Amino acid sequence: MFRTTRTLIATYILTVLLTQIAAAQSSEVGLGLGTFNYTGDLVKFYNFKFSKPAATVFYRANLSSVVSFRAAITAGLIGASEVPTDAFASKRNSSFKHFLFEGSTVMEYHFLNWRDSKRFVRFTPYLFGGVALFGFSGDVDRTQAYSTVQMAIPFGGGVKYVLNPKWYLSLEFGMRKTFFDYLDNISGGDFRNKNYQYGNDSNNDHYYFLGFSITRTFYTIPCPTNPYK
């Protein structure tokens, strides 16, 4: 059942992407560098200490003056070690490190019509949300049988800044809400087992991307009143 769901989502992503590529007059491509981070059984709150390198490439189509569609591939390292909150966590003393690969499609909403040549606005804050598939690999002895390909809901926000009619910069932070509790290889288990390799199976693991990107547009802001030249 879950395999069928993943196939349908992948088909949807590909269909939408090909449809949007046809609208070349509103197209953009970009790449970015940043970090993956994680919260779960080992680390309860976001901790910059566990940020690990990641990179992304993406395609964007502007559907209106404030709404855009984006398809992206993001990959990098993700991992953490135990941040003890009690005696049990100290005994468990677990850690993990994976290579994570993500494909996502999201819709973006910009609060300002920053591409309007009649306005002297070089920046806009924005929000985004969508759907993603991610997979991971690592040298982990699994505590349970599970699939390493899962679905996530990416959402977050950022700021974009225009450099000139063809290039702009972005700073973005996004959370990936998962429906999976084994990203850190720790979840529920037999509490009679004295190896302590179990956690809270009622709280799923989540991961995050914080990054900086540069974008190249394939359209030009009209020149007569262009404030960026």
Language-model segment annotations:
Residues A23-N62, G211-P224:
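Short glycine/proline- and aromatic-enriched beta-strand/turn motifs that initiate or cap beta-hairpins
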Residues S27, S65-F69, R115, K166-L169, ...:
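Repeated loop/turn-to-beta-strand initiation elements of outer-membrane beta-barrel proteins
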Residues S65-D139:
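Gram-negative (and chloroplast) outer-membrane scaffold detector with strong preference
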Residues Q25, K49-P53, F99-G103, F123, ...:
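Residues that define the transmembrane beta-barrel architecture of outer-membrane proteins
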Residues E82-V83, N164-K229:
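Predominantly the C-terminal beta-signal and adjacent terminal strand-loop region
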Residues L33-T39, A75-G79, F111, V131-S137, ...:
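Transmembrane beta-strands of outer-membrane beta-barrel pores
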